[in-house]
From Swiss-Prot:
NCBIfam families in UniProt: POMP_repeat (TIGR01376)
One of the Pfam families matching this protein, by short name: ChlamPMP_M
Full protein name: Probable outer membrane protein pmp21
Top-level taxonomy: Bacteria, Pseudomonadati, Chlamydiota, Chlamydiia, Chlamydiales
Comp. bias regions, Polar residues: 132-145
Topology term for the membrane: Peripheral membrane protein
Compartments it resides in: Secreted, Cell wall; Cell outer membrane
Annotated Autotransporter domain residues: 1328-1609
Amino acid sequence: MVAKKTVRSYRSSFSHSVIVAILSAGIAFEAHSLHSSELDLGVFNKQFEEHSAHVEEAQTSVLKGSDPVNPSQKESEKVLYTQVPLTQGSSGESLDLADANFLEHFQHLFEETTVFGIDQKLVWSDLDTRNFSQPTQEPDTSNAVSEKISSDTKENRKDLETEDPSKKSGLKEVSSDLPKSPETAVAAISEDLEISENISARDPLQGLAFFYKNTSSQSISEKDSSFQGIIFSGSGANSGLGFENLKAPKSGAAVYSDRDIVFENLVKGLSFISCESLEDGSAAGVNIVVTHCGDVTLTDCATGLDLEALRLVKDFSRGGAVFTARNHEVQNNLAGGILSVVGNKGAIVVEKNSAEKSNGGAFACGSFVYSNNENTALWKENQALSGGAISSASDIDIQGNCSAIEFSGNQSLIALGEHIGLTDFVGGGALAAQGTLTLRNNAVVQCVKNTSKTHGGAILAGTVDLNETISEVAFKQNTAALTGGALSANDKVIIANNFGEILFEQNEVRNHGGAIYCGCRSNPKLEQKDSGENINIIGNSGAITFLKNKASVLEVMTQAEDYAGGGALWGHNVLLDSNSGNIQFIGNIGGSTFWIGEYVGGGAILSTDRVTISNNSGDVVFKGNKGQCLAQKYVAPQETAPVESDASSTNKDEKSLNACSHGDHYPPKTVEEEVPPSLLEEHPVVSSTDIRGGGAILAQHIFITDNTGNLRFSGNLGGGEESSTVGDLAIVGGGALLSTNEVNVCSNQNVVFSDNVTSNGCDSGGAILAKKVDISANHSVEFVSNGSGKFGGAVCALNESVNITDNGSAVSFSKNRTRLGGAGVAAPQGSVTICGNQGNIAFKENFVFGSENQRSGGGAIIANSSVNIQDNAGDILFVSNSTGSYGGAIFVGSLVASEGSNPRTLTITGNSGDILFAKNSTQTAASLSEKDSFGGGAIYTQNLKIVKNAGNVSFYGNRAPSGAGVQIADGGTVCLEAFGGDILFEGNINFDGSFNAIHLCGNDSKIVELSAVQDKNIIFQDAITYEENTIRGLPDKDVSPLSAPSLIFNSKPQDDSAQHHEGTIRFSRGVSKIPQIAAIQEGTLALSQNAELWLAGLKQETGSSIVLSAGSILRIFDSQVDSSAPLPTENKEETLVSAGVQINMSSPTPNKDKAVDTPVLADIISITVDLSSFVPEQDGTLPLPPEIIIPKGTKLHSNAIDLKIIDPTNVGYENHALLSSHKDIPLISLKTAEGMTGTPTADASLSNIKIDVSLPSITPATYGHTGVWSESKMEDGRLVVGWQPTGYKLNPEKQGALVLNNLWSHYTDLRALKQEIFAHHTIAQRMELDFSTNVWGSGLGVVEDCQNIGEFDGFKHHLTGYALGLDTQLVEDFLIGGCFSQFFGKTESQSYKAKNDVKSYMGAAYAGILAGPWLIKGAFVYGNINNDLTTDYGTLGISTGSWIGKGFIAGTSIDYRYIVNPRRFISAIVSTVVPFVEAEYVRIDLPEISEQGKEVRTFQKTRFENVAIPFGFALEHAYSRGSRAEVNSVQLAYVFDVYRKGPVSLITLKDAAYSWKSYGVDIPCKAWKARLSNNTEWNSYLSTYLAFNYEWREDLIAYDFNGGIRIIF
């Protein structure tokens, strides 16, 4: 059966390639660790050559009786390898275990390194010796029996080998009553020396098929690199080796070697099936190598080793149902314990192996290498305490494999118990390594449905290194109880430089890290010594996806646990850097509604310190992840450890909070809400320091920087549920991101946060919640449709600031929502800064729900201390934002009424684009107890500063109960400056229907400055209102009120370098009552028609102007003026003093002892009245003159006022109602009134004021009525001036030339149709179709441009339309036909805003006669033209008029056709020369016209007639081929208008009673015309045509084009 021989060979079956394979897989020699990327054969070659230098000589002699090779011999001696060819396997089914020699022909036992040669498939099977011994509980004593047998008979072995074979066969048989236990068996055998020699060569306890026992006295050393052990080497295509159903009590049931085992070149494969050991492995050795084999099948093996009883469950080298590789003698794993599966060509199946009470369901080793294998590998349904498939006390290296590797259904069975705690390093459903687990440069790797009852559903390792994969790596549906649904690592997880897709899908863990956990298990709260990242996902070009992983899914907890969650990743520091492939976190869950703890959440990522996402060029997506929800149950009291005292508990809460935040937290004071008692009973508060949420990420620090790919956070859910309750100090929320310190989103390309939600009533930050948030230097940023239950529908910084700065493109917050404040951005304890952004900034349709019983504010932004919007380059939009109580767009302040009154300021300055607040609103009306506190349709703040902006600042259509535009809190100030654009308040409406620009609350808020630079305006179309009319800012009693104003209009610069303000402050509508003493220092204070401005005093300084319009009122009132401040009087030596007493200046108390001087509250030196504002009402009533009203009992400071009448729009003299007839015109009215409620009346004391009137001069540029102004006079407090009209000067825009020019345009339209008829339908080519009938259709276009000629206005005319016609030859060479057409177009004035829209209908009849070379043709075209005229006169209004014009054109032409001799060369270009002459007559009638609207005119009817004689020639080229005939023609003509009657119309301007004759533009009578045409007959039934006509006259260009199709019958 076995031919045994010993040979010396240079190359034994244990070939050089095996060693290379081992080295390349990373096996260590003399502490050198070589990897595939670092392969250096020098280390091996040097050692190998030292041991085999002299083996090159072939030795064929057989050594008999010599000693085995001594490993301790000198390196220069030759190494001997015993070669044993195997010819057949063995079966133990027929063996009698009671026979002492039952292993004689079954087991191969050797004491020297042996190479077994195999050339066919051999199987050892069906032997069970487990009953020979029960496994020992001590790992080393289990080998004592074998060692004893070997030592006792060592001296006899040489004799046994040289003994005659016949003697061997004559040995006594072992008695049938031989004890079954090995101890008694050895004792019995020792009594009989004859059989002891045989038994010593066979061991029924292990290595039933192959047993290698090293007999050397020298143990394996760390320096010994020579090979010792068993080599199974296949040769030939049929070589294979199998072990089936071999079961033994000790390690290595089938194969045992106390040195190394090598399986190589087994083409038909290697198999271990249903083998079992009660200790370690079916095959056990110091190192095991499987290389260059075919299919490897390792199934249904088991080990009965009980590490729990031995207290060795953490020894990952023990167990292994199939292979166990460990060194018993040397603790340094570099000297042994390596299990290598390298370079195999067949499939590897490792299935249903079991190590129920030990580690490594299939393999247990010191380190494991799986490298360079070419076919698929499957580890399926294996189980063990740790490492369901493989366990390693050091590293696991899986690299360079070409085909798929799958770990599925493997289980780690170890669970929490008396000796296993939460922090023990155990688990690994498929793989467990106490060192580094490397997956490198593999094709496909899949870990599916592996489970662990502790850590690492698929993998448990100190470090996991996944890199350089070229295809998919997938972890799917793995589960763990404690940490890492897929991977759990102590030190680091590295996913780097992968080219293929990495997928973590539906992995689940009860506690931490749904897909990956990496961190310290002893105390996850503590920072690790190494501050670097411990989860690194870097440099990957393939996609990485975390899909539907779950963490912290317990429903009932027995104790509280912090730092739980991380649906995909859990780590101390997490880094996603420099990935070019897309990274996606989708549908991961990091928590449940039942979890109890203080730092819980992170739907995708939970980090105890820092998360960094940087430098990624691929997209990074977080979608549909769900963070921790608040607990709804108490910790089960009957299962909980004793609760600490209140003091210790409080101290623990504070320490825990500080640990996670690295600083103090100051959660905002919120509005106190009553929680129903039933809700408190059902869902009690668990902790007052809960930190929960982060639908995508929960960490202490979050940095998202320098990513060039798109970043998208979409549909993530963080925070609590609707029914949850939390304590006052809870920090809950962050629909996408939750950080207890800062979130930095900086220098990225495109960032989008959409549909992220944290919906509990105490949750904040629908997208981002942090202590501080920085969003800066990104290209574009968008927050859309995010929502929260408390603050920050999109972004919330609970303690400090939100900074949105230096972004390069658009920043958008739209459709975000929340309940309390800041649907876009919230900083309830800090500030908001929006600064230095280069693109547009938009806050649109953000919504704060609010309620009638709860304060809320800031539809777009809420901040406690300040909002600063500064130095942004693009437009800034706040549109359609809404809130409950305060600030539809922006609220700066506190929602807690009792909170301190620190200054709150909104600053908008230095911005380059336009700023718009439009359609923002508050929804809740103020209650009676808070009458004016709710409001601010656009803005609610204490201090408002809008200055130095380059664009317009507009407030349009905002709504609120008060302060529809802006509301200012008590004690606040307003400073507005129109710098580079206007500031406008228009259409801002309070709930009561009143228009309100700014509302100031309390009795101390005020406007400090309203200024505009030159040519800029601050325009109040809406009124300014105050809650209290107490006069603000009265000076000390020794200072005159007018000398210390509290309101400045157009402030003067303090020095020459400062900005002058010479623009206009305009109040355009409503009544603005400002209880402040004001001064206008420069520029203009203007009141538009019917506007009213009430002031407590007004001082006008030199160089400024006050412009009043008709119906406007400037009123000075004296209500609640404190008399402790003196008023200026005529007698400066006398002062009115009444300390602390409020007086009514209209009822002064006379002093009988001395005269009381008249006080002065208005110091006005000049008034300007806008003449153009005296526009009559609809019924023709003239408006009232502007009024100046002062308090009764006071006077104007000066008895002289300069009154200037101006006409700023140059239309003042177009006021027909005012100036068309002689009348006395009141220009201004001076009155007095008592208090704020008194009726203004004329006061005789004001009639003595001297008013110098300056009237507007009439210049050549002045149009309208002319006349003479008379001297002014005072009548009943009114200044009256007389007007005597002398004439009217017509503005050229009213000349009406466009109406008359339309007649020429109609002529061009009629002629265009006539020219089509002459060019296509009455030509010789058509006449040659005898007795045919044609139906045709065409499209036409006309363009005409006439410049201004002299004083006459030119025009531009455009027209398009279509025509349909039919013609026939009744007799030969005689054609008649007709057509219908419709045109649409317009005619516009060259100089003015006047346009006439045209829609015309035309009909035509035509005929032609062909007589030899003569062609006579004629046409008659009639038109009915509808006209709609619109004239825009700007401020004067618009007039319209409509009429129908009628006209016709008749023309005839005579052509002579000269055919060019075809023999001439020119005939190739011109076949026919056609001279012609035409006669043409046109007549167009204009009916009488009456306009509607403003400045209406009437036009008398008139007519336009013209007779023209065109003559010239045409050059034709005819071409025919088959049924196709084509004629191309070029025509040139000169036109002379022999008669013309131009239109002249008498036009009347009704309101001015002025008439004049108007003429159309004088078109020159001479013209040149050219035409290009093509007529093609494609066959006897179809023809097409095209033509372009061009006409040139001096100052006029016209051209038309036509094209059509003709069907021939």
